[in-house]
């Protein structure tokens, strides 16, 4: 009789485990955040937001990215590994909007919810995009570029951008071009595409200044491109003749803004991007519907006239 009772108890416990998931961490949602890299202040800001949301929403969250922001194949491997590791949702900033699409589609086919942050991917499986309105940010860069000139002065612009295949760089450049179409005295002279390293971005900016001496505006389209633009202007002692506009904020670029190598920074909110990415990933994994429209985070233009304003300090001095 004792043996039979124990057997019945064991069967009951086994059934309870099957129904409730013994061995799992409660009902915690598993979220894999996969960014383009992890080695810049921008991504550190995203990670801070991710970690805060993981705590707030009691989620099991991993944060990974390739060593290089050009290595889409490594990013695809991380996507596939996240699926094998049992992720309920993936939050992705895509390196290549086309070459990352197949891995995203495969993950979605396995039931994983997909949230896109910062840089989009060409996949219908994406439930929601969260990040900067990059067209609007590009227009803001155009406005900042021409602000230092009195019409009809000739404005000759050089661009230092990231890879053509990366969605946010392409969108920012298009927004800039849209804005400049209404400025008849402004013209883009040349575009350089650089890898996401200080050395490569600086070399690209130096080439523009050397090969096109008529350039009087340089624009860098992300954190690394901005640092390269600032370094090239500093090394050429060109701050008095070349207006510089960049994206993002770290201790170096903010110092360049204060000392004059940079004239304006288009500042994003990476903390909010990371936080909201996890917040919506948890909601989607729990069966909630995604918002009908993209969730756009704050973007602001900082210059020497407003960089110490209270609201701007929150964006500029998060490092």
Predicted regions mapped to residue ranges:
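Extracytoplasmic "Venus flytrap"
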Residues: 32-49, 53, 57, 62-76, ...
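Hydrophobic alpha-helical
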Residues: 80-83, 88-108, 176, 194-256
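Short, solvent-exposed amphipathic alpha-helices that sit
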Residues: 42-56, 137-144, 167-186, 200, ...
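Bacterial signal peptide processing site
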Residues: 23-25
């Amino acid at each position: 009789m004792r043996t039979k009772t124990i057997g019945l108890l064991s069967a009951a416990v086994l059934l309870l485990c099957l129904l409730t998931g013994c061995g799992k961490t409660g009902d915690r949602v598993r979220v894999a955040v996969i960014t383009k890299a992890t080695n810049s202040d921008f991504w550190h800001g995203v990670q801070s937001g991710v970690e805060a949301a993981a705590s707030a929403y009691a989620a099991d969250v991993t944060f990974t990215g390739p060593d290089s922001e050009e290595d889409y194949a490594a990013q695809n491997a991380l996507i596939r590994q996240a699926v094998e590791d049992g992720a309920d949702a993936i939050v992705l900033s895509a390196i290549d909007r086309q070459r990352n699409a197949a891995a995203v589609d495969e993950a979605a086919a396995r039931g994983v919810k997909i949230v896109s942050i910062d840089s989009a991917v060409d996949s219908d499986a994406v439930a929601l995009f969260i990040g900067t309105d990059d067209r609007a940010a590009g227009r803001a860069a155009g406005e900042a570029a021409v602000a230092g000139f009195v019409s009809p002065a000739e404005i000759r612009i050089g661009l230092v951008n990231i890879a053509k295949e990366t969605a946010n760089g392409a969108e920012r450049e298009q927004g800039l071009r849209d804005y400049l179409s209404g400025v008849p005295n402004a013209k883009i002279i040349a575009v350089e595409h650089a890898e996401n390293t200080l050395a490569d971005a600086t070399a690209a900016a130096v080439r523009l200044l050397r090969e096109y001496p008529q350039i009087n505006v340089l624009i860098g389209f992300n954190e690394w491109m901005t640092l390269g633009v600032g370094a090239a202007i500093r090394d050429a002692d060109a701050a008095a003749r070349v207006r510089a506009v960049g994206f993002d904020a770290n201790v170096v670029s903010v110092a360049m803004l204060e000392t004059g190598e940079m004239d304006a920074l288009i500042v994003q909110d990476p903390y909010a991007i990371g936080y909201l990415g996890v917040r919506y990933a948890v909601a989607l994994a729990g069966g909630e519907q995604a918002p009908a429209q993209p969730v756009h985070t704050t973007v602001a233009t900082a210059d020497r006239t407003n960089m110490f304003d209270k609201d701007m300090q929150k964006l500029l001095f998060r490092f």
